[in-house]
Design a protein with these regions (language model features):
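Long helical/loop segments within the catalytic core of UDP-sugar-dependent glycosyltransferases
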Residues: 24, 35, 40-42, 52-53, ...
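Acidic metal-phosphate-binding loop of nucleotide-sugar-dependent transferases
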Residues: 62-63
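Acidic donor-binding segment of Leloir-type glycosyltransferases
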Residues: 1-33
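Catalytic donor-sugar/metal-binding loop of nucleotide-sugar-dependent glycosyltransferases
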Residues: 155-173
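Basic/Trp-rich segment in TM-proximal cytosolic loops or flexible interdomain/linker regions
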Residues: 179-183, 187-315, 334-342
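Hydrophobic, aromatic-rich membrane-embedded alpha-helical segments
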Residues: 312-329
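Short, conserved alpha-helix that lines the donor NDP-sugar binding/gating region
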Residues: 17-21, 39-48, 155-156
Length: 342
């Protein structure tokens, strides 16, 4: 009797409304119908038709563990200044390689988001089941379209007004995750584009001490990574083509043979007189740090330490595909090309 479920039909063209009507007899379930306007309008419509002290939204492709709600609510009970709590998102029963890679990535995210929660640096409250005090919406307003990343914009807005956001690492919400690389690319393109544009929208609060870790480290680190990824990708491609040209030059000089020896050092720019060893060493350290945080994240979820070879698959494959959506998102941002939801 303490929970009210509001289901919104956002202008569907199938039999969604007929299915929802089967639940209207339940006293704690309210069904609403509106013209299609996008997720943020549907969530706002539900908020406007509710009167509860706490508000949460659950995506259609997600579900929660039985104890998740109770675990998240303890954060509000312990600290009345906590205005939102984010859960840990996990991939349910991955069936494709793409979903398996996301499962490993989300293990890493469990650890990183907990750290951000402790330091006050959370910049996104995930759509699936983040819980807010109603005060957030009465004081700051409802969700905005925000470049199709309303869950990120509301977190930026809350940080701007010094509203505390925490993260409950043992509150698990499961999602299916994109099944194909193409679907994953579209999802991440939207996420990265949203980050770039929301950062630009809230640029006036960046690098200011009064906004704490969020302003000084969390978002700037994301911006640096946006710049570093295409830069590193460029260096890598330069070295690859440089190696190919050296092979061609060698074959032209000594004739064709089957000796494919290639001394690959990444990256090696003689023009800058930079030691290749320093780049290689830094790269190794970064990979080891990511690997360690993935293992720690998995430990937080399962209670057990252990190395999983899927970590290697994730790090190798994502190293090649992640720059694609990062570069495209930055291109879209620079040339004002909006991204679609799907």
């Amino acid at each position: 009797d303490k929970i009210t479920i509001i289901a919104v039909d956002d202008g569907s063209t199938d039999n969604t409304w007929e299915v929802l009507k089967k639940f209207e007899k339940h006293s704690n379930i309210k069904i609403l119908k509106k013209e299609n306007g996008g997720k943020h309008t549907a969530v706002n419509y539900a908020i406007q038709n509710s009167d509860s002290e706490f508000v949460s939204c659950l995506d259609a492709d997600s579900f929660v563990e039985p104890e998740t709600l109770k675990r998240m609510m303890t954060y509000f009970l312990k600290d009345e200044n906590t205005m939102a709590v984010a859960p840990s998102i996990l991939v349910h029963n991955p069936k494709t390689l793409t979903q398996t890679l996301q499962q490993v990535e989300y293990n890493w995210a469990v650890f990183m988001k907990k750290v951000l929660g402790i330091l006050g640096g959370i910049y996104v409250t995930p759509g699936p089941f983040s819980i807010f005090r109603r005060k957030v919406f009465t004081d700051l307003g409802l969700f905005k379209k925000a470049h199709n990343t309303e869950d990120m914009e509301i977190a930026f807005r809350m940080q701007k007004h010094h509203y505390k956001i925490d993260q409950c690492n043992d509150a698990y919400v499961y999602t299916t995750g994109p099944k194909t690389i193409v679907a994953l690319y579209k999802q991440r393109l939207r996420w990265i584009y949203g980050f770039v544009m929301n950062t630009y929208d809230y640029r006036k609060i960046l690098l200011k001490k009064e906004y704490g870790f969020f302003s000084l480290i969390s978002v700037p680190a994301g911006v640096v990574s946006m710049i570093a990824v295409p830069y590193i990708l460029g260096l890598l491609m330069f070295q690859i083509f440089k190696g190919i040209f050296k092979l061609i030059e060698k074959y032209q000089t000594v004739g064709f043979d089957f000796n494919f020896g290639w001394n690959f050092a990444w990256p090696n720019f003689d023009m800058f007189f930079v030691s290749t060893n320093a780049y290689v060493f830094t790269g190794i350290i970064l990979y080891l740090l990511v690997m360690s945080t993935i293992i720690i994240g998995k430990r937080m979820i399962t209670g057990k330490y252990g190395f999983d070879f899927r970590i290697i698959y994730f790090m190798v494959i994502f190293s090649f595909i992640a720059p694609l959506w990062v570069v495209r998102a930055m291109y879209n941002a620079v040339f004002a090309k909006k991204t679609a939801w799907r």
